[in-house]
């Protein structure tokens, strides 16, 4: 692919084999739940999910003497292992040149508002340790000749704190962490889907799951029970929530699971959307060099005619080309960037083409077509920041594909691995849902509102309205480590719980009553309705009336599911049916939070423009004002708090809470603060100690 990088290196960075799992463990016991005989496993701590964050938590618990197991729907098959971009980013404090300022980094992490200041500082100061430990495990982060980590600029990053192993950074992270987890003897229960958290006395006692291989005449639904003292939710984000999604197929996350257990969720209004290839083929983010080489973006109508549609939006070819380039490091849609002919006008234009029934393509064998009345495309006619970047990269080649081959041959090689040759044919793409910034509410140790339950990774709502690219991978590592430290200090996980699992039989009976193969709502109907509603009403353009209508429809669907149940289509689909029931709850939760925010006067920020005929902001195009997307601006006061949602019975309640503060002027003092570390006072263990009967021996 390139004379600069040998093929064997390209292969190693794109084809990343994962470790083989050991043989499944036999259950510790079998218990009778009604008329079902259910296998029972006991562990001190259970991690749900096998992505980078969950594996980090499992490794850190194991290193501290914990008896930990992992339960996963598909080992090495989630977002961490199967997603990426041109050079997938890990965002950490800069360890080269003059180093970094953790407080400045924390400020950058929460610059978009609605993020806790203490969390931002934790992610900043913990990032160096997280990166170093990954390097110790074998993650091949690039260095200069003197040992400094190579850096570049990414989304919402004015300093240049990004680094990368190439398009498969997170998969490589999963690989080294999985190898370590297996080396430490961590059991992995594969093809095991958690469907209900068990609670007794206000504390977690276990998890009910389903596993197809456990199906039998005495256990027709394949139930599996895990008894545990601590539970870590690390199943990622709700990728199936949207029709237009760049998540790998089958990523459900655990928001619905958390709602059913009464956990508090936070910042559900905050997501991330951006351009990428659809998951019907090979889902991948088209950020970085894919757009920095400035390919020709066009649409095709039903008759096959091509449309240079971006020329309707930008005033000159130079302006158009420069903003296509800027999508490389301004990749997520941002409402404010629709103004003044900036880069998110590209996203808006793509969405509007889709609404016309047109398909949108990126052609790497053609430079951008000119804007009418403007000069043709030329590398000599670009905005200064764009020209400087391409000059520094040595990207003076005539065609986008040659510039891409020079700047990042891995970007070409990756698609070729999935039978897509972008050097030979145009690439179809769209604006897709990519990340949930909100999630399960956690404190500074990753604890949720239910004692004994923790959340890490995309499952945890630690991000604000915006975030730097790659900061989510860092947050998962930092909080995975902190959760491991906290569980280790508590002693919860040293010994598995003994005795009966309270409430298991009642939960099994409740779920059996919900499963109605003959009369329930078909799984496909739930999927189609939820995904269409979320993509059409809760994407980058939100019309208040449409959001309210969507919420009413979501409530009606959940009421129908409560009354009629859900119908698995075939044997082995019980887990998927229950996940879609939970996804319907998650959809209602997101729409409830969004409707509350909008009804309270909330404005546009981050991923969503709140369209309003009386809005202060009016995007302009070359052809005139875009009145249909006039939008409200964000109120400064909304940056200072977050919306917390909880399900009580069948109703969802929302309340605002202020962002947690952090005293940037405070200073630790060794002699004063060392005793808190030595005694474990830093872990605040008194607030969630298990009942005496559950204390490890």
Question: Residue ranges of each PLM-predicted region?
Answer:
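Conserved redox-cofactor binding core of oxidoreductases
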Residues: 22, 130-221, 234, 277-289, ...
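An anion/pyrophosphate-binding glycine-rich loop and adjacent beta-alpha core
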Residues: 264-410, 486
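Extreme N-terminal leader/targeting segments of oxidoreductases
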Residues: 1-44, 165, 686-697
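Core beta-strand elements of the Rossmann-like FAD/NAD(P) dinucleotide-binding domain
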Residues: 40-43, 218-230, 449
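Glycine-rich FAD pyrophosphate-binding loop
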Residues: 63-84
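N-terminal Rossmann-like FAD-binding beta1-loop-alpha1 element of flavoenzymes
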Residues: 43-70
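Long, amphipathic alpha-helical stalk/connector segments used for oligomerization, subunit docking
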Residues: 492-573
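Glycine-rich loop(s) and the adjacent beta-strand/alpha-helix scaffold that form part
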Residues: 230-284, 470-486
């Amino acid at each position: 692919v390139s004379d600069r990088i040998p093929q064997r290196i390209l292969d190693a960075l794109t084809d990343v084999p994962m470790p083989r799992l050991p043989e499944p463990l036999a259950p510790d016991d079998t218990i009778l739940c009604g008329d079902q005989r259910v296998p029972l496993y006991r562990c001190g701590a259970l991690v749900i999910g096998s992505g980078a964050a969950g594996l980090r938590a499992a490794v850190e618990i194991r290193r501290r003497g914990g008896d930990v197991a992992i339960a996963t729907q598909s080992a090495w098959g989630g977002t961490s292992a199967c997603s990426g971009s041109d050079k997938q980013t890990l965002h950490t404090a800069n360890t080269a040149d003059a180093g970094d300022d953790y407080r400045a980094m924390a400020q950058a992490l929460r610059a978009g508002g609605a993020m806790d200041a203490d969390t931002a500082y934790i992610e900043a100061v913990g990032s160096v340790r997280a990166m170093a430990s990954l390097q110790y495990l074998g993650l091949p982060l690039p260095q200069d000749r003197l040992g400094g980590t190579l850096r570049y600029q990414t989304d919402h990053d004015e300093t240049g704190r990004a680094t990368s192993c190439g398009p498969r950074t997170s998969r490589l992270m999963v690989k080294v962490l999985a190898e370590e987890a297996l080396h430490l003897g961590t059991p992995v229960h594969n093809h095991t889907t958690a469907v209900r958290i068990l609670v007794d006395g206000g504390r977690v006692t276990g998890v009910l799951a389903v596993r197809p291989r456990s199906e039998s005449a005495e256990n027709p639904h394949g139930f599996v029970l895990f008894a545990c003292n601590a539970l870590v939710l690390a199943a990622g984000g709700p990728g199936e929530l949207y029709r237009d999604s760049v998540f790998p197929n089958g990523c459900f996350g655990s928001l619905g699971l958390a709602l059913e257990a009464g956990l508090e969720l936070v910042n559900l209004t905050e997501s991330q959307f951006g351009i990428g290839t659809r998951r019907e083929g090979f889902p991948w983010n088209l950020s970085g060099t894919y757009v920095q080489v400035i390919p020709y973006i066009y649409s095709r109508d039903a008759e096959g005619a091509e449309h240079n549609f971006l020329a309707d939006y930008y005033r000159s070819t130079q302006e158009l080309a420069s903003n296509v380039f800027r999508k490389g490091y301004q990749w997520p849609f941002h409402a404010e960037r629709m103004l003044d002919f900036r880069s998110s006008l590209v996203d808006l234009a793509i969405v509007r083409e889709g609404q016309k029934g047109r398909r949108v393509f990126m052609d790497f064998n053609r430079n951008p077509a000119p804007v009418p009345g403007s000069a043709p495309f030329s590398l000599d006619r670009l905005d200064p920041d764009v020209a400087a970047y391409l000059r520094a990269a040595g990207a003076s080649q005539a065609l986008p594909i040659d510039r891409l081959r020079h700047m990042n041959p891995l970007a070409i090689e990756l698609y070729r691995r999935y039978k897509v040759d972008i050097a030979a044919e145009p690439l179809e793409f769209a604006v897709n849902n990519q990340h949930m910034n909100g999630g399960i509410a956690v404190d500074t140790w990753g604890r949720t509102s239910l004692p004994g339950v923790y959340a890490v990774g995309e499952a945890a709502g630690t991000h604000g309205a915006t975030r730097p690219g790659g900061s989510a991978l860092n947050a998962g590592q930092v909080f995975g480590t902190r959760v491991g430290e906290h569980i280790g200090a508590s002693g919860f996980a040293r010994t598995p719980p003994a005795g009966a699992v309270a409430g298991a039989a009642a939960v099994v009976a409740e779920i059996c009553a919900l499963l109605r193969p003959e009369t329930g709502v078909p799984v496909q109907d739930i999927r189609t309705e939820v995904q269409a509603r979320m993509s059409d009403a809760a994407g980058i353009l939100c019309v208040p009336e449409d959001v309210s209508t969507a919420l009413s429809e979501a409530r009606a669907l959940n009421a129908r599911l409560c009354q009629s149940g859900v119908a698995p289509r075939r044997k082995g689909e019980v887990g998927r049916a229950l996940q879609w029931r939970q996804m319907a709850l998650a959809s209602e939760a997101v729409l409830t939070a969004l409707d509350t925010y909008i009804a309270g006067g909330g404005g546009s920020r981050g991923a969503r423009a709140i369209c309003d005929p009386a809005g202060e902001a009016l995007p302009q195009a070359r052809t005139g004002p875009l009145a249909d997307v006039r939008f409200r601006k964000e109120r400064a006061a909304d940056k200072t708090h977050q919306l917390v949602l909880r399900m009580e019975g069948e109703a969802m309640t929302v309340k605002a809470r202020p962002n947690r503060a952090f005293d940037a002027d405070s200073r630790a003092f060794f002699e004063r603060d060392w005793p808190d570390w030595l005694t474990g006072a830093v872990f605040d263990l008194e607030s969630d100690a298990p009942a005496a009967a559950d204390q490890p021996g």
